[in-house]
Amino acid sequence: MIAVSGGGTGGHFFPALAFTNYVLKKEKVKFIGSKRGIEYELKDLIKTEKLFLDVEPLRERNFYQKLKAIWKFLKAQEEINEFLKEDYRALIFGGYASLPLGINTVLRRKELFIHEQNSIPSKTNKILSKKAKKVLITFNYTKRFFPEGVRVGLPIRKELKKKLPKKEVKKRFGLEPDKITVLIFGGSQGALFLNELARDLKSVLPKEFQVILLTGKIHYEKFKNLEGEKFRVMPFSLDMGLIYSASDVAISRAGAGTINELSHFGVPSVFVPYPYAVDDHQFYNAKEIEKLGGGLVLRQEEAKPDKVLSALKEIVKNLERYSENIKKFFAEGAEERMYEELLG
């Protein structure tokens, strides 16, 4: 039996979910997450036995808050012991939600496997890696931290695997099939900076460009008035496969999930990494793609409309090459590779 844990954010949860659903066809699997994370909101997507713990991150808390978090962590150990009575091996995907299972696995001397999504490992994964049987990685840069790390890639959601004809999907969005479609988005929550950038770009975009802007739910009301002839504005999309299929190039953040999905669909990007990401990991994620020739990277303070437009034009000028290069990052069959590593 395999115990899987990963959550808190979509970046940790969705790969864990994809792996869990894959393993269900092979052997018994149980999922452990947090009641505070996105995994609890989306618990109906987890088609196996699941346990949600009342745990919270330790970072940036005062003494009493940390004491409370530690008490919750100890209580979680009892719940995990009750939930995992049979023999198991564990795969954790990082984030505070997976630390309780990681510690439990070490204390019970079970086999622990770690998957690191980002170029720079999370604090949880750094702590637990010393006791792990194997560390599985997504970015080659991560080998600086885990020299023995095995690159398996990042699992992708089943609904994103199907690619659709680009011109046909553009028409479904009411866009011109032969114009360059620029996808502007900041991940599942949206990004205020990228929404403002989209607003500033609207008046200077060349006529051969059109835009799909995903604002994020909390920003939609502020930016919905950008909707127009060459601008499609949505809070978010439940079918990102359609969005990616319609897109030629993107302006995006550089989370591991975003990069993985763009690479699957061959959509190169002007990456504007989130400047406050822990250890600046989004910047290093994006630089790996830039080195592959699959995108260009601009720091947020550099990302003025003229510079972004210049970067877009550079990519579009060599669109086929950039598209093929970003595809090189995607590791087909990541779930299967991960499972094989757990068996081996």
From Swiss-Prot:
Gene3D superfamilies with a match to the protein in the record: Glycogen Phosphorylase B
GO MF annotation: an example: UDP-N-acetyl-D-glucosamine:N-acetylmuramoyl-L-alanyl-D-glutamyl-meso-2,6-diaminopimelyl-D-alanyl-D-alanine-diphosphoundecaprenol 4-beta-N-acetylglucosaminlytransferase activity
HAMAP family, alphabetized: MurG
Membrane topology: Peripheral membrane protein
Listed EC numbers: 2.4.1.227
Biological pathway: Cell wall biogenesis; peptidoglycan biosynthesis
Protein location: Cell inner membrane
Sorted UniProt keywords: Cell cycle, Cell division, Cell inner membrane, Cell membrane, Cell shape, Cell wall biogenesis/degradation, Glycosyltransferase, Membrane, Peptidoglycan synthesis, Transferase
GO biological process: carbohydrate metabolic process; cell division; cell wall organization; lipid glycosylation; peptidoglycan biosynthetic process; regulation of cell shape
Entry function: Cell wall formation. Catalyzes the transfer of a GlcNAc subunit on undecaprenyl-pyrophosphoryl-MurNAc-pentapeptide (lipid intermediate I) to form undecaprenyl-pyrophosphoryl-MurNAc-(pentapeptide)GlcNAc (lipid intermediate II).
Lineage of the species this protein comes from: Bacteria, Pseudomonadati, Aquificota, Aquificia, Aquificales
Protein name: UDP-N-acetylglucosamine--N-acetylmuramyl-(pentapeptide) pyrophosphoryl-undecaprenol N-acetylglucosamine transferase
Enzyme class: transferase
